[in-house]
Amino acid sequence: MPFVVVITGIPGVGKSTITRLALQRTRAKFRVVNFGDIMFQEAVKAGWVSHRDEVRKLSLKVQRELQLKAAQRILEISQKEPVLLDTHATIKTPLGYMLGFPREVIEVINPRFMVIIEANPSEILGRRLRDLKRDRDVETEDQIQRHQDLNRAATISYAMHSNALIKIIENHEDKGLEEAVNELVKILDLAVNEDA
């Protein structure tokens, strides 16, 4: 039976770092799949983009097509091994925010658990400014908070369509990365035990 745990958070929240460190400590065995990477691979194959950050600037129709292709690939993988899906619940596009999982996509992936990583907007802004590898939009702290609020709302909607459980993990500078990683390890261990 397919088994997917979604981990989401807005760019700069520390989602990928927390995921990487948690997987080194958990007893559970997951294959990490990045939803955006699969969309990017499909877009490159089609000749639409050459850089990952260009995907979110494609037309909504093309992005939705890429989302569905990615979902189908993830389903195939999850039928063979548990998947930890690193993704975004909402994507900021030039026209507004797009759902990371439209109904037809969430129904294909059908996750068991959804983990949201959050932080204070000032922390996220600082992390984004230090990350020179990515072409990130410049946003105010208010815009960052709005994006996090949209992520929560979207994740609740996804859970309604998949019956997934939701967990929010805070990744604050003062709280420490270690605590956030430990929380994710607990969730991953419980998720696999819950499925057994």
UniProtKB/Swiss-Prot annotation:
Transmembrane recorded as keyword: no
Record's subcellular location: Cytoplasm
Keywords annotated in UniProt: ATP-binding, Cytoplasm, Kinase, Nucleotide-binding, Transferase
Keyword Cytoplasm among record annotations: yes
Gene3D superfamilies: P-loop containing nucleotide triphosphate hydrolases
Gene Ontology CC: cytoplasm
Gene Ontology MF term list: adenylate kinase activity; ATP binding
Enzyme class, UniProt record, top EC level: transferase
Catalysed reactions listed for this entry: AMP + ATP = 2 ADP
Main localization, broad class: cytoplasm
Binding-site residues, ATP: 9-17
EC number: 2.7.4.3
NCBIfam families named among the record's database cross-references: PRK04040.1
Protein family per UniProt: Belongs to the archaeal adenylate kinase family.
UniProt-recorded name of the protein: Adenylate kinase
Species name: Thermococcus sibiricus (strain DSM 12597 / MM 739)
Organism lineage string: Archaea, Methanobacteriati, Methanobacteriota, Thermococci, Thermococcales
